[in-house]
Structure formats: C-alpha cells, structure tokens
Amino acid sequence: MDKLDNINKAIYDQYRAVVLCANFSDCNQVLTTIKSIVCHNRFIKFYVINSDFPTEWFVSMRKKLAKLACQIINARVSSSLVSNCKTDSSYTVFLRYFVADFVEEDKALYLDCDIVVTRDLSSLFETELGDAPIAAVKDLGGEVYFGEQIFNSGVLLINVNYWRENDIAGQLIEMTDNLHDKVTQDDQSILNMLFENRWLELPLL
C-alpha cells in the first residue's frame, strides 16, 4: 500500500487548496501538474479556474482523485467577464485574479501549469502569512534585469481571506485595465506593483 494512504487525515483541519488556471487547450499541462502533486500529497482540493473546460472532464477527474483522497472543483469564470478586461496577452492571465471568489480555505497555493511538484507540500502550507497578502519566491532575474527585488508569480501562497476582504480581484483588474500597455511582464508586473513591500519571501523550492 502507498505509504501516503496511511497519512492520518486528522492532522489536517481541512483539505489543502491548490489553484490552477488554464483554458482547455492546456489540459495536458494541468493533468501533468496534478499528477505530480498527488504522487507526493494527499487531501488536496484542486481548484481549476477556467472558462471552457467541459463538465465531463471534471466528472472523470473527480472519480480518479477520490481514490487518492483528493478533490477537484470546476471554478468556472464566464468568458464574457474576462473578455471585458483590457490586455495584450491571453485572457488566462486574469484567471488567478478570481482565487478568492472560489476558494473556501483560508489560504491557497497557486501554481502555474508548467510546474512539476517533486515533494510533500505540507511545510509550504504551514507558512504563516499573518497580514501579508501572499508569500512568493524571489525572482532571481529581478535585480539583474529590472534593478529591483520582485517575486515570481508562478508560485504564490495566497492569503485568501485578505484577498476577499480587500477586493484584490477588483484592484488587479483596475490596475490591468490602466497599465497593461505600460508593463513588461504582464500580470506578474501588476501583481508585483500591487503587493510591493507587502509579500513574504518563500525559500527556493
């Protein structure tokens, strides 16, 4: 028997939330990331924020993940909502803005869908966020190319309560509408501007 199946669920107050954002054309990448996570973790609730994944995909995934003590949620954002946002990039860059609209847990781990997880994530979820809106890994190229310390938006431990109470989605959308043609790194630039000097640094994974 997989030793992960022997983990006592009682050690967790609730499922740990992992957020992935994609359109259906990237479903293979989403699947690869999910597989890598469940190889090393149990009691994960996956939120896939999307606008076009078919319901049948989630039905199939729920059956498979239930055997691994995991869940998956179809966090559907209407295409009309994201199409109203101004951007020079794919609308999928906006999807992570809506984390607090769907996630029930106090914190959530957002991962880009090109990430492969190679270890237990428990210690990461135990990070105390306090009043910080996010914890993130420093982007090593920030000081070299931009002369400033910035974070990489591909891995974010999100303080969901903070996002909800402070309407972070609304702030991000407004900033994107106003600045999308003035920034160099799309949504990563916007996130860094909003959370400047307010984010916690995570160790390199």
Please annotate each region the language model reported:
Residues 45-52, 136:
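Short internal beta-strands
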Residues 111:
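Catalytic metal- and UDP-sugar-binding loop of GT-A-like glycosyltransferases, i.e.
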Residues 56-58, 63-102:
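Active-site-proximal specificity loops/subdomain of glycosyltransferases
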Residues 108:
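Short aromatic/hydrophobic "clamp" motif used to bind/position activated sugar donors
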Residues 36-44:
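Short, acidic, metal-binding catalytic loop of nucleotide-sugar glycosyltransferases
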Residues 115-146:
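Conserved donor-nucleotide/metal-binding helix-loop-beta segment in metal-dependent transferases, i.e.
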Residues 1-32:
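N-proximal low-complexity "stem/linker" segments adjacent to membrane-targeting elements
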Residues 150-205:
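Catalytic core and acceptor-binding pocket of nucleotide-sugar-dependent glycosyltransferases
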